[in-house]
């Protein structure tokens, strides 16, 4: 039985130059593991709370309080416990914090410990993390949802939609899907250059040109796909993360593309997009608390496209359960730092899958070289992963880990492909 012997933590930098928490654990059998915690640019109101210092250092974004929480409170509480009892460890962390939103110790402190313990336990057992968490049947490689054009909170442009993604659903393997997506990414750069548009990068490695709006961005990407010789729709489909909470207010509704719109008008806009483009997924099309709008939208177009709840659900089993009961959305975005422990993350995924909801594993805009989510995507069989463009090493690290996993699985590996999107029809309605 592997026993926790040492727990340490430090302040490191994420991909946006902001401090974050890194945790290291050592077991009595000599096993050592570390985990680093990501953070988001557009965060949901209902997410677990990151503990920041709020002082002069790093503009108030330092995390020494969270680091000290690990060293002074968490470490003494879990040293001597068995590392292979993840649920027990995570429950001990929740009990120690004692708040519903993890605001006392900080979700960044708690998650770092939770993930580091899991990685150490896997290594102690002689198993890859995906195998340790997913068991002997974990073998599905996810479709990479590659954010190749950035807007919203991820870029300093006038484009309201936060992410424009390509999904290489027609590829025969993850390795080929990565190649296809990467070739489209480079093709898009050429298309942008030819049109005199910026090829500067946003937070997640995608290009951040200042284009006229959603349709203009989708047209650029469609052109880039076709320029590679791949088929738009059959080979490479499109997806959006609207992040609608970012442009919603109770007073004005949705301030989108220089117009004030209602939830119904936003729904009509999405229906038009579905008629015109091969969209497989739309994330956060409405605000995080617009439950009635979500239900109406799901009823209207949920049989045609994946509707993903990110800010709506914040990887929280309780909010997900409410959404399932109401009939809001049909997929869950999974971000481990939104909820703050591995156990709660796995519980949310289990609830989603048992209720017929799809899941998409996701990074954050402030990332590190940690590759846990790549293993987690395979472990839970999500069939989809969102971890940015094929650029910037903190994004590529996850893709490279998935290449290793596919190679490890050998003939047992299966690429999710278009089966990850059962609601999608290759040909647009009109």
Curated annotation (Swiss-Prot):
Mg(2+) binds at residues 241, 283, 310. GO terms for biological process: glycolytic process. It catalyses: (2R)-2-phosphoglycerate = phosphoenolpyruvate + H2O. Catalyzes the reversible conversion of 2-phosphoglycerate (2-PG) into phosphoenolpyruvate (PEP). It is essential for the degradation of carbohydrates via glycolysis. NCBIfam families: eno (TIGR01060). It holds the Pfam family Enolase_N. One of its GO terms (cellular component) is extracellular region. GO terms for molecular function: magnesium ion binding; phosphopyruvate hydratase activity. Its cofactor is Mg(2+). (2R)-2-phosphoglycerate binds at residues 162, 335, 364-365, 386. Its main location: cytoplasm. This is Enolase. It is found in: Cytoplasm; Secreted; Cell surface. The gene is eno. Its EC number is 4.2.1.11. The lineage of its organism: Bacteria, Bacillati, Actinomycetota, Actinomycetes, Mycobacteriales. Keywords: Cytoplasm, Glycolysis, Lyase, Magnesium, Metal-binding, Secreted. Binds a second Mg(2+) ion via substrate during catalysis. Pathway: Carbohydrate degradation; glycolysis; pyruvate from D-glyceraldehyde 3-phosphate: step 4/5. InterPro entries: Enolase, Enolase-like_C_sf, Enolase-like_N, Enolase_C, Enolase_CS, Enolase_N. The active site is at 204 (proton donor), 335 (proton acceptor). Belongs to the enolase family.
């Amino acid at each position: 039985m592997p026993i926790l012997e040492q727990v340490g933590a430090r302040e490191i930098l994420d991909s946006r130059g902001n401090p974050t928490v890194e945790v290291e654990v050592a077991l009595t059998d000599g096993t050592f593991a570390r985990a680093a915690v990501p953070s988001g640019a557009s965060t949901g109101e209902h997410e677990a709370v990151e503990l920041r210092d709020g002082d002069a250092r790093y503009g108030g974004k330092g995390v020494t309080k969270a680091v000290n929480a690990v060293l002074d409170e968490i470490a003494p509480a879990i040293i001597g416990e068995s590392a292979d009892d993840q649920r027990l460890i995570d429950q001990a962390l929740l009990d120690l914090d004692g708040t519903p939103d993890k605001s006392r110790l900080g979700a960044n402190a708690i998650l770092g410990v939770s993930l580091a313990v899991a990685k150490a336990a896997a290594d102690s057992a002689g198993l890859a993390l995906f195998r340790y968490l997913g068991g002997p049947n974990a073998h599905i490689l996810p479709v990479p949802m590659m954010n190749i054009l950035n807007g919203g909170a991820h870029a300093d442009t006038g484009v309201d939609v936060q992410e424009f993604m390509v999904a290489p659903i027609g590829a025969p393997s993850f390795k080929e899907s990565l190649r296809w997506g990467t070739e489209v990414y480079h093709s898009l750069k050429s298309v942008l250059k030819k049109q005199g548009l910026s090829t500067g990068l946003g937070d997640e490695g995608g290009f951040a040109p200042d284009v006229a709006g959603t349709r203009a961005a989708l047209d650029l990407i469609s052109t880039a796909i076709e320029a590679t010789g791949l088929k738009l729709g059959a080979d490479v489909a499109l997806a959006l993360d609207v992040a609608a909470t970012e442009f919603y207010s109770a007073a004005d509704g949705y301030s989108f593309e220089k117009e004030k719109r209602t939830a119904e008008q936003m729904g009509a806009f999405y229906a038009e997009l579905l008629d015109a483009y091969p969209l497989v997924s739309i994330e956060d099309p409405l605000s995080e608390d617009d439950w009635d709008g979500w239900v109406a939208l799901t009823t209207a177009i949920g049989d045609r496209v994946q509707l993903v709840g990110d800010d709506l659900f914040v990887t929280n089993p309780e909010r997900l359960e409410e959404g399932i009961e109401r009939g809001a959305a049909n997929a869950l975005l999974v971000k481990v730092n939104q909820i703050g422990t591995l156990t709660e993350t796995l519980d949310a995924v289990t609830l989603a899958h048992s209720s017929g909801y799809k899941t998409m594993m996701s990074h954050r805009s402030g990332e590190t070289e940690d590759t846990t989510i790549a293993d987690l995507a395979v472990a839970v069989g999500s069939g989809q992963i969102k971890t940015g463009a094929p650029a910037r090493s903190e994004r590529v690290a996850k893709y490279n880990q998935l290449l290793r996993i596919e190679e490890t699985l050998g003939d047992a590996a299966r690429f999710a492909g278009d089966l990850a999107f059962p609601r999608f029809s290759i040909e647009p309605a009109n």
